Amino acid sequence: MGGVKLFATKESLFSARIQWALKLKGVEYEFILEDLANKSPLLLKYNPIYKKVPVLVHGDNVIVESLVILEYIEETWKEHPLLPRDSYDRATARFWAKFNDEKLVPPVWTACTGEGEAQEKAKESVLESLALLEKQIEGKKFFGGEQIGYLDLVLGWISYWISAVEEAGGNKVLEAEMFPSLHQWGQNFIHTPLIEECIPAREAFVAYVQYAIIYIRSISANKP
């Protein structure tokens, strides 16, 4: 089939889940760092519709969109299964993965870095979503049980990404006291060696987010 290449950025929460999956599966791959301000011709060639990371190239196969890539990885490399065996449990995991990408991820940035009424509304939405996930993880080490699974990889960004964006933006969203089970899960997840390997250095990541905040706010301020 050929080698495996991952076009990604170190900061992308969607790229991280693919790195984690490949690591857990023991798949050797080439990490190709993309600059989203100056996208490479190969990235635009492989993902001409969305023009974004991550992109997985496996021989002649090109796969885009992180949840689709995770499914491809699961079906191609059988070692360390990520999805549950039971069909209902698999469907449930996929439901919460979609919930994460559609309901939780979009408002988090505004909740942590926004201002005024928009920030308050976004924070309310995020807290509602986190409360639902808190119920799902109660009494469990991981969403996948005793081992890291598909849903842990999808939600893994919560364990480090939110706190870094909170620090950069100055707004607290994820309080350990409000979501103790989710907080403990995050600690279990982030301190797993294979997971920790793919997390960007804290100081550099916070600096990256701070720059992004300044850039986005400057664009908003200059809008007519």
Positions of the model-derived regions?
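GST-like domain detector, emphasizing the conserved glutathione-binding G-site
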Residues: 1-147, 214-224
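Short amphipathic alpha-helical segments embedded in low-complexity Lys/Glu-rich regions
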Residues: 39-40, 113, 172, 202-207
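Short capping/connector residues at structural and topological boundaries
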Residues: 48, 87-88, 147-148, 153, ...
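Hydrophobic/aromatic-lined pockets within catalytic cores
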Residues: 74-78, 101, 138, 159, ...
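Membrane interface segments of multi-pass transport proteins and intramembrane proteases
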Residues: 83, 172-176
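GST superfamily/GST-like fold recognition
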Residues: 103, 145-169, 177-183
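Non-globular targeting/processing and membrane-anchoring segments
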Residues: 122, 131-132, 159-164, 185-224
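Surface-exposed helix-capping loop/turn segments at secondary-structure junctions
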Residues: 135-146, 168-169, 193-199
